[in-house]
Curated annotation (Swiss-Prot):
The lineage of its organism: Eukaryota, Amoebozoa, Evosea, Eumycetozoa, Dictyostelia. This is Pre-mRNA-splicing factor slu7. It comes from Dictyostelium discoideum (Social amoeba). Residues 10-25, 466-478, 489-519, 545-558 have a biased composition (Basic and acidic residues). Pfam families: Slu7 (PF11708). Associated with the spliceosome. A zinc finger (CCHC-type) spans 94-111.
Length: 558
């Protein structure tokens, strides 16, 4: 079945092979064996079981499907300083000219360069090194500690141990000086106490707990930067906030957790709400609104682009929002004027918060003050109390030494509010009182003068009539003269303006005909340097305005 047969199979051979395969699959015949004597599964497809033609496999096998066995690599390292035997006595041809060894050339020699090499002196010829051929794998070649001798580190440990013993001796001498033990004689008890104290000090210096973190940070400026850059051990990593196996919030490649890992938890208790929280903070909402406005404007045919003209887009968006707010306010005002109900939209006054105080006060169950200072009353009168439907408090109005209400100007405390009508009635009442008072004074004056002026009334009245008539005639004459003068001045002014306009036209024509470089300088030393009002008005009427949009307008319809 799986063997590569050189000759062509006959029909009967092919039929027998198929029947044998069916029997093996049904378990009626034993399974086929490979080169190593292992059974081959009869259910393996033929395209997997057949070996390629270039392998020349004469027997059924699955060897071509198995992985290539890895060659066993050396795990050791090169022997350091190993030699093959004794050194030569004479220089050999092809050896190193410096040391005389045959295993390397002169340029690769690791010996100290000699003034005269072994080639010329035949002295101190070095033995040949052992050349090893190690087949190292990928990891062995790149292992930095491959071939390292751990016993060589003992020298470093000895140096540190010597330094530690010297430090302990010095510390012990300082403790002896502190305890006043300057003499050479020492008791064993003193030595034990001092050594115990020395051990305690070393344990305290080596310990590092949460209580000593703050003092360590204030040691010097060099240690501050190091400690600040270290991550606090109490910090929780992002991926530890959500340990649900079925969730896909945390992305290890970018080390980001965009969504909230605990959506069902209380927002006040969550310390981390996802990386998307930062994207919706700050001015991101304003930028999103601006981008939406630009897209909608482009759909409607307006040229608005944030990338090419951000300032223009921002100004257009601000103008759009302002007009939108105006339109909204306009419709609101129209609805309120039509249907009313503005009083229901007013916000309630905020309740004043109780101010905090450090004064200790204690009250009894009945509400009586036991400890603390009593509150000083600002006024003996009740504040903000509106009596009898008044809109203002009692004492908001003052008139003739009496207090009253400012809303209706009532001077009686128990009176009900009469509103604006009460104000009008009060004003009328005051006017009537004033008129009545004036009439009484006039009547008293008339009664006093009636007796003295009865005889001279007729003569004085005729004289007054004559004087009044003459004064009226003079006033009429003066009015006519004034009108005549005004008319004359108006005519003179119109004539002067016409003359000034004519002169200005001539001057404009001259300035057009002449070259600008030949125009003389208008000096104030000329005779007619004083400009009149008519000349100034003519100049303003005839002056060309370049900024006027209708200056060059021509009507082509005629």
């Amino acid at each position: 079945m799986a063997s590569s047969i050189s000759h062509r199979k006959t029909r009967d051979e092919y039929k027998k092979e198929k029947e044998l395969d069916e029997a093996r699959k049904a378990g009626n015949a034993p399974a086929e064996l490979d080169e190593e004597g292992k059974e081959i599964n009869p259910h393996i497809p033929e395209y997997i079981l057949k070996a390629p033609w270039y392998l020349n496999a004469n027997k059924p096998s699955l060897k071509h499907q198995r992985g290539v066995t890895k060659k066993e690599m050396d795990k050791g390292w090169y022997l350091r300083g190993a030699t093959t035997g004794e050194a030569a006595t004479k220089f050999r041809k092809g050896a190193c000219e410096n040391c005389g060894a045959m295993t390397h050339k002169t340029k690769d020699c690791c010996e100290r360069p000699r003034k005269l090499g072994a080639k010329f002196t035949n002295d101190d010829i070095k033995p040949d090194e052992v050349i090893q051929k190690l087949e190292l794998d990928y990891d062995s070649k790149r292992d930095p500690y491959n071939g390292y001798d751990p016993s060589s580190y003992k020298e470093v440990m000895d140096i540190y141990e010597k330094a530690d013993t010297e430090r302990k001796k010095k510390k012990l001498q300082e403790l002896i000086k502190q305890h006043g033990g300057g003499g050479d004689k020492k008791t064993p008890d003193v030595d034990e106490t001092l050594s115990k104290e020395l051990m305690d000090n070393e344990e305290k210096e080596g310990s590092y707990d949460s209580e000593t973190v703050a003092p360590i940070q204030k040691l010097d400026q060099k240690s501050r930067t190091t400690i600040r850059n270290l991550r606090i051990r109490e910090d929780t990593a992002k991926y530890l906030y959500n340990l649900d196996v079925n969730s896909a919030f945390y992305e290890p490649k970018s080390r980001s957790m965009r969504d909230n890992p605990l959506p069902n938890a209380n927002p006040n208790d969550i310390k981390f709400a996802g990386d998307n929280f930062a994207r919706t903070s700050g001015e991101t909402k304003e930028f999103r609104d601006l981008q939406r406005f630009a897209w909608e404007a482009q759909e409607k045919g307006q040229d608005v682009d944030i990338s090419s003209a951000p300032s223009q887009a921002a100004l257009l968006h601000a103008d759009f929002l302002r007009k939108k707010e105006q339109l909204k306010q306009q419709t609101r005002n129209q609805l309120l004027t039509k249907y009313g109900g503005e009083e229901h939209l007013l916000k309630q006054e905020e309740i004043d918060k109780v101010p905090q105080s450090e004064i200790y006060t204690e009250y009894s169950s009945s509400g009586k003050l036991i400890k603390g200072e009593e509150k000083i009353v600002k006024s003996k009168y009740e504040e903000d109390v509106f009596l009898n439907n008044h809109k203002s408090i009692w004492g908001s109005y003052w008139e003739n030494g009496q207090w009253g209400f400012a809303c209706c100007r009532q001077l009686i405390k128990n009176a009900y509010c009469t509103g604006e009508k009460g104000k009008l009635l009060r004003e009328k009442q005051l006017q009537q009182q004033q008129q009545h008072h004036i009439q009484q004074e006039n009547q008293q004056d008339d009664d006093d003068n009636n007796t003295t002026t009865t005889t001279t009334t007729t003569t004085t009245s005729l004289l007054e009539q004559h004087l009044n008539k003459s004064n009226e005639d003079n006033d009429k004459h003066n009015k006519k003269e004034g009108k005549r003068k005004d008319k004359k001045e108006r005519k003179e002014k119109e004539e002067k303006l016409k003359k000034a306009l004519k002169d200005q036209d001539e001057e404009n024509k001259k300035s057009v005909e002449k070259d600008e470089r030949n125009i003389k300088y208008n000096s104030l030393s000329a005779d007619d340097y004083n400009v009149s009002e008519e000349q100034m008005e003519a100049y303003n009427l005839k002056r060309k305005r370049s900024d006027d949009p209708m200056a060059n307008f021509k009507d082509d319809s005629d």
